Amino acid sequence: MIEVGEYKIKEGLYYTKEHEWVQVLEDGTVLVGITDYAQKELGDLAYVELPEVGKVVEKGDVLCEVESVKAVSEVYAPVSGEVIEVNEELADSPEKINEDPYEAWIAKIKPKNLEEELKELMDAKAYAEYLKTL
């Protein structure tokens, strides 16, 4: 784990400037969630609008929304592909994202252009440097 101030960054993941993370699984699918920075900025999450299984997204499309006491925030697709699974636990327990943002994934995506799109994402060290600029 890398720490930047109060924010934790899990190594081995890829990150976006919009504070989503991507974990590449052995079968070539990816898990997507929001970072520690994102959940702390949002505050206590009250609701996660999970995407539909089967939804096809392009990188940068709105994947879903998360709602906190403070704000509603869009979560963007960090890679293009098809949503093949969602984390149903979050429907009843959105606070799991606050408790452990790197375990509480939102969606599993079957990517269509992963190798190319990963090049556009940051690794943990680059994301840590990015957080220092905020």
From Swiss-Prot:
Keywords: Lipoyl. Its cofactor is (R)-lipoate. Gene3D superfamilies: 2.40.50.100. GO terms for cellular component: cytoplasm; glycine cleavage complex. One of its GO terms (biological process) is glycine decarboxylation via glycine cleavage system. InterPro entries: 2-oxoA_DH_lipoyl-BS (IPR003016), Biotin_lipoyl (IPR000089), GCV_H (IPR002930), GCV_H/Fam206 (IPR033753), GCV_H_sub (IPR017453), Single_hybrid_motif (IPR011053). Binds 1 lipoyl cofactor covalently. The modification N6-lipoyllysine is found at K70. Residues 29-110 form the Lipoyl-binding domain. The glycine cleavage system catalyzes the degradation of glycine. The H protein shuttles the methylamine group of glycine from the P protein to the T protein. Belongs to the GcvH family. The glycine cleavage system is composed of four proteins: P, T, L and H. HAMAP family: GcvH (MF_00272). This is Probable glycine cleavage system H protein.
